[in-house]
């Protein structure tokens, strides 16, 4: 028997995937563009600081973002990419004191966010006992992705993120199939389905494939979404009051932040109940 010990869950998941705004140079408030809409009160070009960003890189209206028309800011999650770019890639050198780094820093940020998002999914996949047949491949992909996040700014800019994402996604698909195979009964295949405003109250969606599904404004009150694959599903304004998301696959904090729910909504242990619910 091999003496090699499989990494424990804390070792796998301790990857800095939780946003630490205090260690970031306000990158999401500068690097990314947004347009006046239901999510943002104003237009802002990429690379231009939001007028609410203060000199210390904190938000001047953080406590009032939703009533002031900046709901989108409360939904966004960088998976810890902001502090990685700020403190690791650029070694704590901020774009205000070193304006020559600004353009490159802003371009690297979305690349890093994609890599950190993949780390989130891979770390979760490794916690799934049913996915044990692909754990070795998942672990190798996680280690490769983590190494990529520690590359130089130049290396990150040259990285073919789409190709790497495709490799990882193939493993995530296999993970999903293995995990959902353990759910009894016929599973619903609604990958990429247009379910905007759908009436799915109390629906049995256990083990459903809802990858990339459009669930904007859907009524999911009391729905059973245990072990459903929700990677990339659009849950904006979806009503999850009383829904059971226990064990839902590849659900992220930003998806929950975009949805509606209540104290009765059951969540995976790795995620937090949004303050606005």
Model-derived segments and their meaning:
Residues 173, 181-277:
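Tandem repeat scaffolds
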